[in-house]
Amino acid sequence: MDLIEWFKDRRKNGRLSKEERQREIADGLWTKCVSCAALHYTKDFQLNLCVCPACGHHERVGAPERIPQLVDPDSWVSTDDHLLANDPLGFNDIKSYPERLAQAREKTGLSDAIVTGLATLEGRPIALGVMDFRFMGGSMGSVVGERITRLVERATAERRAAILVCASGGARMQEGVLSLVQMARTSAALQNHRSDRQLFVSVLTNPTTGGVTASFAMLGDIILAEPKATIGFAGRRVIEQTLRQKLPEGFQTAEFLLKHGFVDRIVERAQLRPTLARILRLHGVGQVQAYRPSPQASLAQEQQ
């Protein structure tokens, strides 16, 4: 239902009272695109995977929304949820690190900035990790690094394809060098995975920056990206001030990186699952259970 249809429906069924209007606004009935400012009925926007029908802008989605978009129904088994961050450095800025962790957990319902687990995709076994930017900017601390390392090691041991969906501002400053060490740990686990000739696919979403870009995010055998995702290490302003020169237009976008060979393919969100499924098939990842695609999935495969 778009905006015009909604107004027609309201005209037909009568006007809303002031209380009803306030309730619908408060309940988030409408979603405004941050790119083109188009207004969309929230349920329709979510059914469209949080992609603006007007301009194609890909809104950020959290891990709880992303996982069902990718895995087979009833196949997801979370791993390492019990791992929780503490405060090894006693870090304080405006707020203490434990306070920030508590606020992030209350806001997102997550225990840290990544959710990991085992699942199947079209009946093929995968080890999937999905980062959530809402949790302290998707920053990588010791728990995020540990979960990724364990996930990849489990994928290697069980001969599963590893898939990581990245969304991060980089290393978590509240953990200092303990956060930076995770760059090496995750990279080492992925090198062992590659040495065992197992597949790793990295999916870069908006934004993927800092220490995550400098480590596991760019180590995929195949690197996919969502349209117009910001991908880089330092920010544009920092680089321009350091180099004292203007950067090219579109620098640090998925399209720029694709043009210069750092990304293999840009994939719209609706096509991400069928694209991953096709990659698994082409790389010989066998099915462990029968898979019967829905009519929508069958149509998507035919269109590829």
Swiss-Prot record:
Q: Which reaction does it catalyse?
A: N(6)-carboxybiotinyl-L-lysyl-[protein] + acetyl-CoA = N(6)-biotinyl-L-lysyl-[protein] + malonyl-CoA
Outline the extent of the CoA carboxyltransferase N-terminal domain.
29-298
List required co-factors: Zn(2+)
Name its cellular compartments: Cytoplasm
Pathway listed for it is:
Lipid metabolism; malonyl-CoA biosynthesis; malonyl-CoA from acetyl-CoA: step 1/1
Task: Give its E.C. classification number.
Answer: 2.1.3.15
Biological process according to GO: fatty acid biosynthetic process; malonyl-CoA biosynthetic process
According to UniProt, the name of this protein is Acetyl-coenzyme A carboxylase carboxyl transferase subunit beta
Question: Which gene is transcribed and translated to give this protein?
Answer: accD
